[in-house]
Amino acid sequence: MARYRGPVEKLERRLGVSLAMKGERRLAGKSALDKRPYAPGQHGQRKAKISEYGLQLREKQKAKFMYGVSEKQFRRLFAEAARKDGNTGALLIQLLEQRLDNVVYRMGFATTRRFARQLVTHGHILVNGKRVDIPSYRVEAGQKIEVIEKSKNNPQISRAIELTAQTGIVAWVDVEKDKRFGIFTRKPEREEVIIPVEERYIVELYSK
């Protein structure tokens, strides 16, 4: 299954959560989910009973769409998490958080992961001084993530940094906003990652 490229706000309403895909509108309380917090369509306001499988599928979709990964990428990451010692669900979230596009977003250089992915694919991001244009690149502790020199005054990046003052920066990165770089200091603990996903349902889904 390819990466989702459809209407973002309709997807958020269907899943019932903000996926941080339209950051500035969401922060301003102007997203479709804020105005109409129910599923789209004629019967969207009805509360339908959801099955166990439906719950499992919904949580997987939320994680996939939030981090912008394809089904193939998601399965590969889950398989890797399942091979490791520890809580599979927590390890899956940790692997998703280590994606370069997500780290760029977490450092406040982009208002959404979608824009962060564009910054990476268009060559605006350096990792330890070398250009990396692969959004799925895995960032390790101690690596320096930097906006290239000619893009440091990009108005969209500057606006994202301004908005970060409202949302704050996560604890596992250190960022020099004015210099447009940050250090990924460590892998996050699960309880530090505040996302509306119950990964235990994802583990149940893939464990069948």
From Swiss-Prot:
- Domain S4 RNA-binding positions: 98-161
The UniProt keywords, alphabetically, are:
Ribonucleoprotein, Ribosomal protein, RNA-binding, rRNA-binding
Q: Which GO terms describe its molecular function?
A: rRNA binding; structural constituent of ribosome
One family name in Pfam for this protein: S4
Gene Ontology CC: one annotated term: small ribosomal subunit
**How does the record describe its quaternary structure?**
Part of the 30S ribosomal subunit. Contacts protein S5. The interaction surface between S4 and S5 is involved in control of translational fidelity.
**Physiological role:** One of the primary rRNA binding proteins, it binds directly to 16S rRNA where it nucleates assembly of the body of the 30S subunit. With S5 and S12 plays an important role in translational accuracy.
Indicate the family of this protein.
Belongs to the universal ribosomal protein uS4 family.
The name of this protein is: Small ribosomal subunit protein uS4
Q: Which organism is the protein's source? A: Campylobacter lari (strain RM2100 / D67 / ATCC BAA-1060)
